[in-house]
């Protein structure tokens, strides 16, 4: 694991050392990086709730660089983003794949961004099953329900039809930042801290 950098700040009361993520949190920045799983989701949710309770009138900035991950963990973040009063700006840097693409597109409308060389990947959910035929059938039905739910969210976020999403997520569908903007998954491309 990569060591977490420490930032030292001077104040009238002396020095204070923060890990970089705690320092960014002071500026209402949350980093969603790496695979989405329950522990990561709980940390992201806690930060969203904390920042919203602190000042629900200010935006929260969610930076995303993730290959995706567990759908239920991602949907917990998605539900929290929609539950809180604060606007959530999403900024894709690097990759927002699979469940991360759902979160990237779920930021507050007009405040969904990507950096110029970012990629967004949309596809159908994957999963596996073993055991008796009835158990495999139950898992297959659950994957189909999940696909329907995810495609509905992506359709709502992008303005595309569910039918188009069903077709476009049949296989891995990689989108550049510009293609993601044209598709409606993001609103703008951010370059040099400006919108393109």
UniProtKB/Swiss-Prot annotation:
UniProt cross-references to Pfam families, sorted A to Z: CLP_protease (PF00574)
GO process annotations (BP): protein quality control for misfolded or incompletely synthesized proteins
One cellular component term from this protein's GO annotations in UniProt: cytoplasm
Catalytic activity, reaction form: Hydrolysis of proteins to small peptides in the presence of ATP and magnesium. alpha-casein is the usual test substrate. In the absence of ATP, only oligopeptides shorter than five residues are hydrolyzed (such as succinyl-Leu-Tyr-|-NHMec, and Leu-Tyr-Leu-|-Tyr-Trp, in which cleavage of the -Tyr-|-Leu- and -Tyr-|-Trp bonds also occurs)
Keywords carried by this UniProt record: Cytoplasm, Hydrolase, Protease, Serine protease
EC number(s) reported in the record: 3.4.21.92
CDD domains: S14_ClpP_2
Active site: 98 (nucleophile), 123
MF terms in GO: ATP-dependent peptidase activity; ATPase binding; serine-type endopeptidase activity
Subcellular location: Cytoplasm
InterPro entries membership: ClpP (IPR001907), ClpP/crotonase-like_dom_sf (IPR029045), ClpP/TepA (IPR023562), ClpP_His_AS (IPR033135), ClpP_Ser_AS (IPR018215)
Domain of life: Bacteria
Family: Belongs to the peptidase S14 family.
Assembly information from the UniProt record: Fourteen ClpP subunits assemble into 2 heptameric rings which stack back to back to give a disk-like structure with a central cavity, resembling the structure of eukaryotic proteasomes.
Record function comment: Cleaves peptides in various proteins in a process that requires ATP hydrolysis. Has a chymotrypsin-like activity. Plays a major role in the degradation of misfolded proteins.
Name under which the protein is recorded: ATP-dependent Clp protease proteolytic subunit
Lineage, highest ranks first: Bacteria, Bacillati, Bacillota, Bacilli, Lactobacillales
């Amino acid at each position: 694991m990569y060591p977490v950098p420490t930032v030292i700040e001077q104040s009238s009361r002396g020095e204070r050392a923060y890990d970089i993520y705690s320092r960014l949190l002071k500026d209402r920045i949350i980093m969603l990086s790496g695979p989405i799983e329950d522990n990561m989701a709980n940390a992201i949710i806690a930060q969203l709730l904390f920042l919203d309770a602190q000042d629900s009138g200010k935006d929260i900035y969610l930076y995303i660089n993730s290959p995706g991950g567990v759908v239920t963990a991602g949907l917990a973040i998605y539900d929290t983003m929609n539950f809180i009063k604060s606007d959530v700006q999403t900024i894709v840097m690097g990759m927002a794949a699979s469940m991360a693409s759902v979160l990237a597109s779920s930021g507050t409308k007009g405040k969904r961004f990507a950096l110029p060389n970012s990629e967004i990947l949309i596809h159908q959910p994957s999963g596996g099953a073993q055991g008796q035929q009835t158990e495999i059938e139950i898992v297959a039905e659950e994957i189909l329900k999940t696909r329907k739910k995810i495609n509905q969210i992506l359709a709502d976020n992008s303005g595309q039809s569910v039918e188009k999403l069903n077709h476009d997520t049949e296989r891995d569908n990689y989108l550049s930042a510009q293609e993601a903007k044209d598709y409606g998954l993001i609103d703008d491309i951010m370059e040099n801290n400006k919108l393109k």
